[in-house]
């Protein structure tokens, strides 16, 4: 397998400088799409902000930073999955609804 770019994952970690606790994290995963001429699709995942620090624009800053990073690395789009309760937050970050997520979890009997 040939690797066409240096990094696949980019992780943001936000630390409270007073308490030295992690108060937020977010991840960008870059995926090459065969049907898009090996174009890059950015996936934003695991956006988490500690409840004591929510509604302070930390999550929005992380998401906007990852979107900017994805496009600077030539992604043709950025996608993410979220619950219905988080749609408004992501719309404020400039994303819009597109499709329906499907999933199947691995059973616990897997080796």
Swiss-Prot record:
Pathway: Nucleotide-sugar biosynthesis; UDP-N-acetyl-alpha-D-glucosamine biosynthesis; N-acetyl-alpha-D-glucosamine 1-phosphate from alpha-D-glucosamine 6-phosphate (route I): step 1/2. Signal peptide: none annotated. Substrate binds at residues 33-36, 45-47, 76-77, 81. One of its GO terms (cellular component) is nucleus. Residues 1-111 form the N-acetyltransferase domain. One of its GO terms (molecular function) is glucosamine 6-phosphate N-acetyltransferase activity. The keyword Thylakoid does not apply. Its EC number is 2.3.1.4. The keyword Mitochondrion does not apply. Acetyl-CoA binds at residues 47-49, 55-60, 90-92. GO terms for biological process: UDP-N-acetylglucosamine biosynthetic process. It catalyses: D-glucosamine 6-phosphate + acetyl-CoA = N-acetyl-D-glucosamine 6-phosphate + CoA + H(+). Gene3D superfamilies: 3.40.630.30. InterPro entries: Acyl_CoA_acyltransferase (IPR016181), GNAT_dom (IPR000182), GNPNAT1-like (IPR039143). Keywords: Acyltransferase, Transferase. Belongs to the acetyltransferase family. GNA1 subfamily. This is Glucosamine 6-phosphate N-acetyltransferase. The gene is gna1.
